[in-house]
């Protein structure tokens, strides 16, 4: 058992018989009163996301997560297919459980698969990925390099704010934790 104050983004815990993953967590201290933990949590069986508030002293059951190296192969309907790099077994993970992470997946990408009791519950991505710009507006004459930027749609459908000099077909390094542009590849 651990206290909710010790929970961090990405941790998996059990509460009321449900496997839950912390997507986002904030410590909230109202003007008067005790600190509260505001969290966005995902039910790993249904894929639903709920915003909840808990007291820091509440205890939850931490779940042991097995991690295995894998490779993303392809999309099949509403699931992504991965291959375990040691056993060569293939696993499917529903896009609902992947959430926004599906926008960073490119074929043959190496990832970490997370398992609880033999069931796949999620994917850990590398901190950065290389994606190709599928569509963006052409550079506007007179725009400066350090200007406000413009939206660019990547090959996976992810929309990223990029500098004005970026054009269609450019390969970019994208941060997977916040979806921001880092540099050209």
From Swiss-Prot:
One Pfam family of this chain? EFP_N
- Pathway(s) the chain acts in: Protein biosynthesis; polypeptide chain elongation
* One GO term of the biological process aspect: peptide biosynthetic process
Tell me where it mainly resides.
Answer: cytoplasm
Sorted alphabetically, which keywords does the UniProt record give?
Answer: Cytoplasm, Elongation factor, Protein biosynthesis
Identify the InterPro entries for this entry: Elong-fact-P_C, NA-bd_OB-fold, Rib_uL2_dom2, Transl_elong_fac_P/YeiP, Transl_elong_KOW-like, Transl_elong_P/YeiP_cen, Transl_elong_P/YeiP_CS, Transl_elongation_fac_P
- This protein's GO CC annotations: cytoplasm
Gene Ontology MF term list: translation elongation factor activity
Subcellular location, record wording:
Cytoplasm
Against CDD domains, the record matches this protein to: S1_EF-P_repeat_1 (cd04470), S1_EF-P_repeat_2 (cd05794)
* Keyword Zinc (UniProt): no
What does the record give as the function of this protein?
A: Involved in peptide bond synthesis. Stimulates efficient translation and peptide-bond synthesis on native or reconstituted 70S ribosomes in vitro. Probably functions indirectly by altering the affinity of the ribosome for aminoacyl-tRNA, thus increasing their reactivity as acceptors for peptidyl transferase.
The record's family statement is: Belongs to the elongation factor P family.
Q: Which HAMAP family match?
A: EF_P
Instruction: Please report the name of this protein according to its UniProt entry.
Output: Elongation factor P
